[in-house]
């Protein structure tokens, strides 16, 4: 009977990677060689599962004749289900039905390492991978020696989405009228609200962002005679504010008042306050770091007391806040990692003598200090 190596884990701190299993020592075992590579997947998204299936089918077509075909083994329960299934099969030394690859997070390598089932990718060419994407391997504890035990397959991405029309109403309500500016030449004088004292910086990034914010409000205000959105292919209310293309057309026929008036119905009136947007200078860089972003969001909330900061008797359809977060853990992890300079040694744990060291959580530890800094923000 032929045997083949055990398990590969696909998963990383940012996404998915690959881990192999070895044989010969205490706890290790070989699998029966069934002439195929089993890839365990616990993906819960149908679209992602279908995409994976398409990739595997393509690989099986183009692979060389001497290479084994890949077969997907579906595991229920998401990543946690995959972890439980792997732990069970390793503990009972399942030689027949155990898989060779698994899509999961890289800490599963440590689970395999307890039984000596981890294996280095020492013969895999990773030249086409960004080295930073492989750094998670340096944070895996309990392995026999350092190296690449996992290879990233996909990455998780956090994005920031700005509501252009709403942001325009907020800034336009708070800013002071400028005597001679490009902004004034593009907007009707009657539309410029001279209530506040906010200024918009004149650096190139801010000027570009402000122009796109204006364009999104103009597009949002365009309606047909029936009061519905104009359905022209070259017009959209959603403009890629930071990096999108310029969508300005027929500027003389566009204005922002319609959009601002509609947004005002939901957000209420602007109130000039010392701890709000009074004398505030708006810059595009406010969206590039956590501290300034939270400060700006807080100031906006305090500047719209009627609809935002007043939490008494709020309904589900009312404005719940300025900043919405889809995943609180991801925001916490990303902000703490950034506060530590993007250095794993300053993150939640670090490796010491091959083992996880959580001393960073002590009062004077870097992780504790960074968590405290983020919390105070």
UniProtKB/Swiss-Prot annotation:
Residues 217-260 are annotated as: Disordered. It is a lipid-anchor. The keyword Phosphoprotein does not apply. InterPro entries: Mycoplasma_lipoprotein_cen_dom. Pfam families: Lipoprotein_X (PF03305). One of its GO terms (cellular component) is plasma membrane. A lipid is attached at residue 23 (N-palmitoyl cysteine). Residues 251-260 have a biased composition (Basic and acidic residues). A lipid is attached at residue 23 (S-diacylglycerol cysteine). Residues 1-22 form the signal peptide. The keyword Cell membrane applies. Keywords: Cell membrane, Lipoprotein, Membrane, Palmitate, Signal. Its main location: membrane. It comes from the Bacteria. It is found in: Cell membrane. Belongs to the MG185/MG260 family. This is Uncharacterized lipoprotein MPN_281. It comes from Mycoplasma pneumoniae (strain ATCC 29342 / M129 / Subtype 1).
């Amino acid at each position: 009977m032929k045997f083949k190596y055990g398990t590969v884990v696909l998963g990383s701190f940012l996404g998915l990677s690959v881990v192999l299993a070895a044989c010969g020592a205490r706890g290790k075992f070989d699998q029966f060689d069934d002439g195929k590579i089993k890839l365990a997947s616990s993906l819960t998204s149908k679209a992602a599962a279908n995409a994976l299936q398409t990739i595997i089918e393509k690989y099986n077509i183009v692979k060389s004749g001497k290479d084994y075909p890949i077969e997907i083994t579906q595991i229920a329960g998401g990543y946690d289900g995959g972890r439980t299934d792997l732990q069970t099969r390793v503990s009972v030394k399942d030689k027949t039905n155990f898989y060779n690859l698994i899509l999961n997070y890289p800490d599963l390598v440590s689970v395999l390492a307890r039984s000596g089932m981890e294996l280095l990718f020492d013969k895999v060419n990773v030249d086409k991978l960004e080295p930073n994407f492989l750094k998670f391997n340096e944070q895996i504890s309990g392995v026999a020696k350092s190296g690449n035990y996992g290879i990233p397959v996909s990455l998780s991405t956090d994005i920031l989405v700005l509501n252009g029309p709403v942001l325009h109403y907020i800034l336009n309500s708070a800013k002071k009228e400028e005597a001679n500016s490009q902004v004034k030449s593009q907007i009707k004088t009657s539309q410029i609200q001279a209530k506040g004292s906010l200024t918009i910086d004149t650096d190139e990034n801010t000027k570009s962002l402000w122009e796109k914010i204006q364009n999104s409000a103009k597009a949002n205000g365009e309606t047909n005679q029936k009061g519905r959105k104009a359905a022209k292919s070259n017009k959209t209310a959603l403009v890629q504010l930071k990096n999108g293309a310029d969508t300005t057309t027929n500027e003389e026929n566009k204005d922002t008042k319609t959009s601002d008036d509609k947004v005002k119905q939901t957000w209420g009136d602007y109130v000039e306050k010392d701890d709000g947007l009074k004398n505030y200078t708006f810059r595009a860089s406010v969206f590039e770091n956590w501290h300034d972003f939270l400060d700006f969001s807080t100031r906006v909330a305090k500047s719209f007391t009627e609809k935002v900061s007043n939490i008494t008797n709020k309904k589900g359809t009312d404005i719940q806040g300025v900043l919405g977060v889809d995943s609180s853990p991801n925001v916490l992890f990303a902000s703490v990692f950034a506060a530590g300079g993007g250095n794993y040694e300053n993150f939640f744990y670090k490796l010491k003598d091959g083992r996880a060291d959580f001393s960073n959580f002590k009062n004077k530890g870097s992780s504790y200090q960074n968590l405290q800094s983020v919390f105070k923000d």
